[in-house]
């Protein structure tokens, strides 16, 4: 065995050993329990970043742990290869996106292999390959025929210069990111998936996901947004019908979750695209200008929630069906046409957004909710937001101080007034509804509106149908042919895939496919006449919504997934990825699983049994202000820091010139802040095992990991120490058989070492398996090696115990630092580590013959005693009373009482 730890030599050798033995290439094996571990596949952007390293190391630790525990482990890898970055890079470098993507895949694959991940590369897939997206197109056509996929007009951001649709993130201050042109909203035909048909199941099945973070499930519940409310129809005033047709001339329909507050409505707001807005603007230039302004704004719901609320009155009126009040209709920029009916009733006294709007335009506010606090304690009032001098008022405002208080509306308390639906909130100023609580009023309003045909109860979801059309090139072609005679015709299965041409260099001006007659000119599958192929491509979330099933049988040519493989592998047992994917990707993956189940392709309801959302990798940021008032971000490697006596950075200078730079704080590693660390440089300097160890030891997996050069060096020191420990053991003689059998003849010191060993095995097993806390597992092995170093193992028995400890330590660490452990195992044992299995806990070793017990006097620690593990209560009391500390602090006084906690402490009360 060589004396020095040399990762550059041992890591390639270990990887070759695994590759030659094909230990990570798996197939269905009914004799073993299966374990499908999957980390979210990467976008082939060019290079791995530290977030990738952390993500895939977590998955690898779990995979290797299960492999040693006898599971049939599948850990595949592939590439989420379609998407906008490839098009942008293609335009920048004048290269086809396909060539750029495939080059990146090869480089990143080399990087992944250098980290020693236990990946079954025989299952590798790339979503831009026709053999992959063929089956995506096939499912699309099946669902189109069933009506689950449909076509309708959708609103998009249109760049009039580049003649293309832009994503919301490509619109900067209302202008196209590339052309700088003012963006327009346009209505264009798009394809949608009816995810709303599955909203209830998607919501209910969250309760089945026992091993998902609650935060993720809450985010999905909120995104689905189930609400119970009512559809309310406000009759259009007779003097407001001009220009309106059909039902729009009869009534304005809204959805509300608070029909109990209908008497508090003081105006109605509609979206700019609403027919009533269009009719009102016909002869009013100021309305036309405002509608144009709204249409030029963002189409993102999140942006609308935060933008300044603006509106204009239409001069049109509708009638409140409960009290006959005429309410003015406003066009407001915060109302979405694609959400619900594109109209909302406004109750400014009890809704934050409505209050903000009404205050801006001096619109009336009518309070219809009152908090009743009879019999409540001050503490209960405070908990509800109305106690402790909150300023919400006490009494009726007439000085009576009555216990039955009308707490007046305060805008800063709007949530307490409107968001709470309990018996402490009752209606006022609502006629016959006065005094009713939420539920009673809801039922009364529902009955009244239904009786007069002005509304009915309705359950609604915030979730919208999923629009998957993208007017871009680098994506999966939509398999539809447009025929003037037959309409929209799905491409037959025997004509799939519709192959995307790969030799295209986009110029950013419109859709390349729409300029290629050789692509779009075709014949109708139904009538054989001339037809045009769809030139939109699919949202790239489509590919990532089912790739985990394709891994089960990536070369299967008769369907999306081999039925036998799908039955064996079932759901992914462990999924790993960032919480930023909590809503879209994870929701779409759940949706696709249910679609595929309903097509008879898979036999599971949910795709991922257990979900781990790892934290970000963060690092310090530094900058200098430039002449333009901006910031030039400086890489941490180029900065020299000065620290105070507590190790905190107090100043920083640029190494090349010694001049100050600004310390800007810790942020996620990113190109924009220039605070990334290249994993390849780390691997070249310290080896893959050091990178893996640091990533797993620096923080629990679900928390952010702060980059630390000293932490990396510390990880490398530990691996050198591990190597040196085994080297020194073997230097003293050849490896022996590990200790086995009864430990009756062992010294106390060796028994203590074995106790530490087997308690460590138990802890590390729990840390890897149940808790998934890898940093504490590493710390436990470090503690074990510390005790090993302090134990004399020079005797013949000692060497057998030493062999047992070192063999176990190497296996315990193999999931995290597999290269060094593989090499050390070969030196210690000579066999194949992956065949050795996980070390078993010797229960006998956990039983200690002697234990240490604390001695207290009046509750304060005054000493410790070592006694037999089975010592009686009387023996413990006698031993404690005899200790030097007890004698000193009892000061000759008799013990009033002696409290014994078996195995832990004796407390003498004097």
Swiss-Prot record:
One of its GO terms (biological process) is leucyl-tRNA aminoacylation. Gene3D superfamilies: 2.20.28.290, 3.10.20.590, HUPs, Isoleucyl-tRNA Synthetase, Domain 1, Valyl/Leucyl/Isoleucyl-tRNA synthetase, editing domain. It is found in: Cytoplasm. It catalyses: tRNA(Leu) + L-leucine + ATP = L-leucyl-tRNA(Leu) + AMP + diphosphate. Pfam families: Anticodon_1, tRNA-synt_1, tRNA-synt_1_2, tRNA-synt_1g. ATP binds at residue 671. CDD domains: Anticodon_Ia_Leu_BEm, LeuRS_core. Its main location: cytoplasm. Keywords: Aminoacyl-tRNA synthetase, ATP-binding, Cytoplasm, Ligase, Nucleotide-binding, Protein biosynthesis. GO terms for molecular function: aminoacyl-tRNA deacylase activity; ATP binding; leucine-tRNA ligase activity. The keyword Transmembrane does not apply. A motif ('KMSKS' region) lies at residues 668-672. Coiled coil: none annotated. Its EC number is 6.1.1.4. A motif ('HIGH' region) lies at residues 42-52. HAMAP family: Leu_tRNA_synth_B. Belongs to the class-I aminoacyl-tRNA synthetase family. This is Leucine--tRNA ligase. It comes from Neisseria meningitidis serogroup A / serotype 4A (strain DSM 15465 / Z2491).
